[in-house]
Structures are given as structure tokens and as C-alpha cells.
Amino acid sequence: MLSVEGVSFRYAGGEEPVLRELSISVPAGGIFGLLGPNGAGKTTLISILAGQLRAASGRVTVDGTPLEELRRREPASLGLVPQEFAFYPMLSCAENLRFFGSVQGVGGARLRERVAAVAAFARIESMLARRAGELSGGLRRRLNLAIGLLTEPRILLLDEPTVGVDPQSRSFLLDSIRALAGEGRTLLYTSHYMEEIEAICDRVAIIDAGRVLRDGALDELLRDEAAAVPVRHNNRSLEALFMHLTNRSLRD
């Protein structure tokens, strides 16, 4: 269980906090979705969980162990697939994978094995000799995913992993993420695309302005709101629920 309790954060010079005593509980295994518009605080929370930012207050634990302690003790246990492209465009795909693997403590024969394994999983084997900067948007997203999997993390943070890709690449990435959950990993998935959240997530937290508006199993959320949100469970139901809670669209 990944537990986020009362986490708040404000950027230096910012007038308003980005996260406001935000709490979620992510069960082990499966895919937990964070759904919210741009600026809701999704990326900030991911950055805190990844150790890139420090929360002003609150605590984060994994099975009762403080996240900072877990990162020190088991740095390979948590992986990150950021929204930005996390590689060097002038290096080849293979060079990027070897570099980031070594930075994360993977070396020797295991590094060679992991590079081959993640390249095969992301289906970029034929691209390993090409410079990362020459790849299409969809292939860059696949390389991003491959880098995040190098350490075989049991918890994977995915921040808008399908942004800017064509429908075919999006379908491949979503299928790949489902496969990872099938291997028993715990995935935290952020998006402002409600159709993606509905397609792959077991549980959902709808957030806005740094606060959790609703949190629960997808079917439970829709059933509980059925009286207030007169829509069927289709690809617009989560957006309708969000609009009911905030009086605005996810795309605002």
C-alpha cells in the first residue's frame, strides 16, 4: 500500500499552495488513476513521490515504511516515467538505456539483460542504434517507458505517459501499462484524459486545485454519483462527474 497522508506543497514565490492536505491510498497491485485538469497538482505529487520535491507537510509511506527510508534502502523499488522526455537526444537509445541503468545501480551482465528486456517490452529493439532525438513522438514515449522499467520497480509512477502521441501509439502504451499491472506491479497513473483512466484504472482519485474531490473504485464512483450525474458509464462519464463536482470541464 502506497499511502499519501495530508501532503501539502507550495512553490517558492507562489501565492497559493499547489497541494492542499492531499491524501490518497494506492493498494498494492493494479492501476490507480489521478484524474484532473492541467494545474491540478498531479505532476507535483508525482515529483514528491519520486523524491524530486519535498512536501511542506504530510507523510508518504509504503507498507508503513516512510518513502524516504524506502528510497535509501531499496532505491530500485520505485520507478518514474515523467511527462517530459527523460533521455539525452544526442545519444542512441541503447546508450541512453545503458547510462540510466548504470546511474540507477544496474551494472554488468544484469544491465545488458535489462536493456534487452525493456527494449523488447517497449518494442524498440530495432531502434537501439538510432539517436533518441530522431525518434517519433510515440517512439520517444516508448523509450521513456523503457527507462522507467530498467530497475524492475515494484511501484511505477507514470505522469501523462501518452501526451502528444498518435492513436496507434497511445493504444500500444495503454496495452503495455495494463501488462505491467498484470505482473503485480503497483502503478500510479496521471492523466487529464478521462477515457484513458476509465480504460485501464482500477481505482481513481479526481483532483482539482490540489485537493481530492472523489476517491474510490471506478464503478463505485459512478454508482454513487448516478443520482446526481445522469449519464451512462461511457467515455464521458468521468468528465461529467468532474463537471458536476467543479462546474467546469477537464479541458479548462
Feature roles, as predicted:
Residues 215-216:
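ABC ATPase "signature
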Residues 58-69, 73-74:
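Conserved ABC transporter NBD signature motif
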Residues 98, 102, 109-127:
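Conserved ABC ATPase "signature" region
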Residues 156-160:
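Catalytic Walker B motif of ABC-type/P-loop ATPase nucleotide-binding domains
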Residues 50:
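Helix-to-loop junction immediately C-terminal to a conserved catalytic motif
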Residues 131-138:
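Conserved ABC ATPase signature
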